[in-house]
């Protein structure tokens, strides 16, 4: 009789354990399912991608970013963003891409655009300083600190204007262009086309800048005169050591 009672208690305890285990398993599976659903339906954010597919579901708007003063100048600069929102699988995707730059001259109380049309996207805008290593734009902009700001003499740009690989997107996988402008943004000029990869740049010496890039699977270097905005020489690197 006692053995039957003991067996009965053990069976009840096992039933409770099995029930608790089942509930925990259900809760775990439910949490996993909720996580998967949230991940599948959330809005994904990407940068420097423009969707050019003929899709009525793509919602686009432009937005001007924050104005920041250019070091060594009273002129301010701000990016123009193209923001696209479109369906992606079970959720949505939002892309933010820089299409242009606007400048403001507080002395003349006027604003102007770097390019006459806002198309394609800018992958980078690099501020160049005289007789020193180039610095990222956000590091040379005027700031409230005791250090003397380094004047910017020009900007170097890497941009993409066309969908060259026909994937219905404009991004860094397409062929690029390399361009320059003066520090005030009033003399924008594209100097190099059909760039597969931007490989870097040198310090400015005697108002000249060397730009390294890949084109036709070959690494090349272009020497640019910043005053005339012309390429004074262009050569290839040897493909063999």
Language-model regions, residue ranges each:
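Conserved beta-propeller blade repeats
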Residues: 121-156, 194-212, 231, 238-241
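Beta-propeller blade signature
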Residues: 100-104, 174-183, 225
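Surface loop/turn motifs at the tips and blade-to-blade linkers of beta-strand repeat domains
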Residues: 115-118, 191-195
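Short extracytoplasmic/periplasmic juxtamembrane "stem" segments immediately C-terminal to an N-terminal membrane anchor
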Residues: 44-65
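Hydrophobic membrane-insertion alpha-helices, especially the h-region
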Residues: 13-35
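Acidic, glycine-anchored loop motifs typical of Ca2+
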Residues: 163-172
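A short beta-strand motif characteristic of beta-propeller blades
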Residues: 112-113, 187-191, 233
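Extracytoplasmic/periplasmic/luminal assembly and interaction segments
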Residues: 64-125
């Amino acid at each position: 009789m006692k053995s039957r009672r003991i067996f009965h208690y053990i069976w009840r305890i096992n039933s409770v354990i099995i029930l608790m285990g089942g509930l925990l398993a259900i809760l775990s599976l439910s949490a996993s399912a909720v996580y998967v659903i949230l991940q599948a339906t959330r809005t994904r954010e990407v940068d420097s991608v423009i969707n050019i597919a003929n899709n009525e579901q793509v919602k686009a708007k432009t937005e001007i970013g924050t104005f920041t003063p250019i070091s060594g100048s009273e002129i301010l600069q701000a990016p123009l963003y193209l923001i696209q929102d479109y369906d992606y699988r079970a959720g949505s995707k939002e892309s933010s891409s820089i299409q242009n730059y606007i400048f403001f001259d507080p002395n003349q109380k006027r604003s102007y655009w770097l390019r006459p049309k806002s198309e394609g996207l800018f992958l980078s805008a690099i501020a160049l300083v005289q007789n020193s290593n180039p610095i990222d734009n956000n590091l040379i902009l005027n700031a409230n600190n005791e250090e003397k700001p380094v004047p910017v003499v020009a900007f170097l740009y890497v941009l993409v204007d066309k969908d060259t690989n026909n994937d219905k997107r404009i991004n860094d996988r397409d062929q690029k262009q390399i361009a320059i402008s003066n520090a005030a943004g009033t003399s924008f000029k594209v100097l190099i086309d059909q760039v597969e990869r931007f490989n870097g740049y040198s310090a400015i010496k005697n108002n000249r800048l060397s730009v390294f890039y890949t084109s036709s699977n070959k690494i090349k270097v272009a020497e640019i005169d910043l005053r005339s905005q012309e390429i004074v020489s262009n050569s290839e690197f040897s493909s063999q050591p």
